[in-house]
From Swiss-Prot:
One of its GO terms (cellular component) is cytosol. Keywords: Actin-binding, Cell projection, Cytoplasm, Cytoskeleton. Signal peptide: none annotated. The keyword Transmembrane helix does not apply. Pfam families: ARPC4. GO terms for biological process: actin filament polymerization; actin nucleation; Arp2/3 complex-mediated actin nucleation; exocytosis; phagocytosis. InterPro entries: ARPC2/4, ARPC4. It is found in: Cytoplasm, Cytoskeleton; Cytoplasm, Cytosol; Cytoplasm, Cell cortex; Cell projection, Pseudopodium. Component of the Arp2/3 complex composed of arpB/Arp2, arpC/Arp3, arcA/p41-arc, arcB/p34-arc, arcC/p21-arc, arcD/p20-arc and arcE/p16-arc. Interacts with carmil (via the region between the LRR domain and COOH-terminal proline-rich domain); carmil is required for Arp2/3-dependent actin nucleation. Arp2/3 complex, MyoB, MyoC, and the alpha and beta subunits of capping protein all form a larger complex with carmil. The keyword Magnesium does not apply. The lineage of its organism: Eukaryota, Amoebozoa, Evosea, Eumycetozoa, Dictyostelia. This is Actin-related protein 2/3 complex subunit 4. Belongs to the ARPC4 family. Functions as a component of the Arp2/3 complex which is involved in regulation of actin polymerization and together with an activating nucleation-promoting factor (NPF) mediates the formation of branched actin networks. Seems to contact the pointed end of the daughter actin filament. The Arp2/3 complex is involved in organizing the actin system in cell motility and chemotaxis, in phagocytosis and macropinocytosis, at late steps of endosome processing, and in mitosis.
Length: 169
């Protein structure tokens, strides 16, 4: 992790830790139903104000909290067109395997690349600090993987170009 990312990730970690105070809350409309309020938004008093933590205009996190759920949406760093293509392919690969991640949503919030949904059942079954650590580690790993893929792609392109130009020499 680069030192420039540390304050950004610490801010996200602290905000997630503070907002993980979820509790069981049954539906006010249908008896014995418990749906994540951040998704259904049946009543305004149960949904808190969303928080956006941005490092720049392309790299930001949206944290939406309600009484029984929290939705974390991440926009991945995209500095050029190669990053955009790699991020899109990588996110699509992960979303196809969303059931393996438990808290990963198949469809992200509009304007973001990837989203997580944590409900009170997740916080009852798992440690809250481990959930926060997973999300932060996930963000670090995505950045690292995309950077590695970009380096590999550039090296491969350089090799292909040099082999092609050897034919003209």
């Amino acid at each position: 992790m680069s030192t420039a990312q540390v304050p950004y990730l610490n801010c996200i970690r602290n905000t997630l830790t503070a907002s993980m105070c979820l509790q069981n809350f049954g539906s006010q409309i249908v008896e014995r139903h418990n749906k994540p309020e951040v998704e259904v938004k049946t009543s305004k008093e149960l949904v808190l104000n969303p928080v956006i933590i941005a490092r720049n205009k392309n790299e930001r996190v949206l944290i939406e909290t309600s009484i029984n759920s929290i939705r974390i949406s991440v926009s991945i760093k995209k500095s050029d067109e190669v990053d955009v293509i790699l991020a899109k392919k990588f996110v699509r690969f992960l979303q196809q395997r969303a059931e393996n991640f438990i808290i990963l949503r198949r469809k992200p919030v509009e304007g973001y690349d990837i989203s997580f949904l944590v409900t009170n059942f997740h916080t009852e079954n798992m440690f809250k600090h481990k959930l926060v650590d997973f999300i932060i580690q996930f963000m670090e790993d995505i950045d690292r993987e995309i950077s590695d893929l970009k380096l590999t792609l550039n090296a491969r392109g350089r090799i292909v170009a040099s082999e092609y130009l050897k034919n003209f020499a």
